[in-house]
Amino acid sequence: MEPRFLLMADVAEQLNVSASQVYHMVRSGELPAIKIGGRGQWRIERSKLEEYIERKYAETAEWVRTNPLVEKDDPDLS
């Protein structure tokens, strides 16, 4: 069974970003997390990470829908 909570480093690895980027997402409220222990270590619930990823897919799909690719924008299509 996979752990319910992930370390920020684990989330950074899964998203292929830096730990500082994950910290910024948490502190900005973009990615829900909890602070636990005496040293206040951050933990991200696996389900919250999955919800975040799904939300990003939806946002990207909306952006693609409202910003159609024009041939002159992509040199590979010329």
Where are the predicted features?
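Major-groove DNA-recognition helix of helix-turn-helix-type DNA-binding domains
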Residues: 15-42
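Basic Lys/Arg-rich amphipathic helical interaction modules
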Residues: 1-16, 20-24, 46-78
